[in-house]
Amino acid sequence: MSKIIFMGTPDFSTKILEMLIAEHEVIAVVTQPDRPVGRKKVMTPPPVKRVATKHQIPVYQPEKLKDSQELESLLSLESDLIVTAAFGQLLPESLLNAPKLGAINVHASLLPKYRGGAPIHQAIIDGEEETGITIMYMVKKLDAGNIISQQSIRIEEEDNVGTMHDKLSFLGAELLKKTLPSIIDNTNDSIPQDDALATFASNIRREDERVDWNMSAQAIHNHIRGLSPWPVAYTTMNEKNLKLFSAFIVKGKKGNPGTIIETTKHELIIATGSDDAIALTEIQPAGKKRMKVTDYLSGVQESLVGKVLL
């Protein structure tokens, strides 16, 4: 049975780790440090740590892996393979070269498209109709190693980051399970990536979350679902932030971009930079919980038609 070091952090990684524990010998898990979460700043372990602790697997949590004491400990382990999935740090070259079979990564895009830390978000924001999982050998350059296997999956119009995250997490574990035997036996035919076709999906910044109402209705719809349920697209109304969780396109309604042109029992309908509008169905006003627009409108006394979102 192969001795594997697993490196990952968020929920996306847990299905992959659970599969490895069931099928192989995971001798160590490396994840990010515990972080303060919520308004009360409660120190919270990463999801991967909870899985590892449940199975009594040693856990390493370096703030920075390079030149750390944890790195020295990992280098001393006689591992056959390193598997990473959304770890969140680049691996030092010494660690990449340490295992007998090298290091592989489970990446949530069809490489060479969407290298980087936010491939699921960016694929949806860009209006892609499919994405997938790539399993590749790791090299020093970010997400640029030889491709071992890939599997695509359709992005439906109603999908958002949350639904695609879950689908890709399961797909990643499934594809890795199928691919590992050829990696362990060293019988796979990996192929180089074409760097000329590479695109990048950098981590989402705060300024990326704001909606530009001058964009087309389709682009705004993709923007909202490409950031839902995290980190969440937002706009401002009455100089207060308004988070936008779900919406749909209303054909053939137009007006000045960002203007509320109609309200119904269930929606706020906003003009965009195209001939179609956006109907908001789930929002979170500043200082309040996430709610259906129906519930929001039941507490609003004034007419919102004509108000402008910025």
Swiss-Prot record:
Function: Attaches a formyl group to the free amino group of methionyl-tRNA(fMet). The formyl group appears to play a dual role in the initiator identity of N-formylmethionyl-tRNA by promoting its recognition by IF2 and preventing the misappropriation of this tRNA by the elongation apparatus.
Highest taxon of source: Bacteria
Reactions catalysed: L-methionyl-tRNA(fMet) + (6R)-10-formyltetrahydrofolate = N-formyl-L-methionyl-tRNA(fMet) + (6S)-5,6,7,8-tetrahydrofolate + H(+)
Annotated binding of (6S)-5,6,7,8-tetrahydrofolate, by residue: 109-112
A single GO cellular-component term on record: cytosol
InterPro entries: Fmt, Formyl_trans_C, Formyl_trans_C_sf, Formyl_transf_N, Formyl_transf_N_sf, Formyl_transferase-like_C_sf, GART_AS, Met-tRNA-FMT_C
PROSITE patterns: GART (PS00373)
UniProt keyword annotation of Protein biosynthesis present: yes
Record keyword tRNA processing present: no
Similarity comment: Belongs to the Fmt family.
Enzyme Commission identifier(s): 2.1.2.9
This protein's UniProt keywords: Protein biosynthesis, Transferase
Source organism: Staphylococcus epidermidis (strain ATCC 12228 / FDA PCI 1200)
NCBIfam families: fmt (TIGR00460)
The protein's name in its UniProt record: Methionyl-tRNA formyltransferase
Enzyme class: transferase
GO MF term set: methionyl-tRNA formyltransferase activity
